[in-house]
């Protein structure tokens, strides 16, 4: 029985999906772990990324009006120093390591992580409080240099 062969049909070029664009960075689901939008972890990752990308005003926006520096001196001076450091100092890796969060009261969390600046690494602690703008830093300290 001589069956009829059907020639393959070439796809219509107009119906082809456009080639996917290359991403500047891997999708979020390849990150250290899935991070909920609006979560304290997301706020800390965005803060760290803004610093790594030298965006001083974006970094400064993460500090709450209630921010109190661990060192003596006012919050305004501390945030100005931080902006200078972000703009002109060593840029940290955008990726934070060993990020842990714990509750510190209603709408308040303490987040610890390792932040690397080239060969130097520091264990940092941020205390964040949730306000109308989202999670904002109310305290920041370096726990140790690794």
Place the predicted regions along the sequence by residue.
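K/E-rich alpha-helical interaction surfaces of small helical-bundle regulatory domains
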Residues: 52-57, 131-134
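Aromatic-residue detector
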Residues: 7, 16-19, 49-50, 59-61, ...
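Low-complexity, intrinsically disordered terminal/linker segments enriched in charged
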Residues: 6-27, 31, 138-146
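Generic N-terminal initiation segments characterized by hydrophobic and/or small/turn-forming residues
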Residues: 13, 20, 93-96, 110, ...
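Exposed beta-sheet edge and beta->alpha loop/turn motif
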Residues: 100-146
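Short solvent-exposed beta->alpha transition segments
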Residues: 19-36, 41-42, 46-49, 56-104
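Juxtamembrane proline-rich low-complexity "stalk" or linker regions positioned immediately after a signal peptide
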Residues: 1-3
């Amino acid at each position: 029985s001589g069956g009829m062969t059907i020639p393959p049909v070439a796809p219509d070029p107009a119906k082809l999906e456009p080639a996917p664009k290359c991403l500047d960075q891997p999708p979020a689901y390849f990150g250290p772990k899935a991070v909920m939008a609006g979560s304290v972890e997301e706020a800390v990752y965005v803060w760290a990324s803004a610093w790594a990308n030298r965006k001083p005003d974006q970094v400064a926006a993460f500090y709450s009006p209630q921010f109190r520096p661990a060192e003596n001196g006012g919050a305004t001076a501390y945030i100005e120093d931080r902006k200078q450091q972000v703009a002109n100092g060593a840029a940290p890796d955008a990726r934070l390591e060993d990020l842990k969060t714990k509750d510190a009261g209603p709408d308040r969390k303490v987040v610890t992580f390792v932040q690397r600046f080239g060969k130097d690494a520091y264990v940092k602690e941020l205390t964040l409080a949730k306000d109308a703008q989202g999670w904002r830093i109310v305290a920041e300290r370096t726990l140790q240099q690794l």
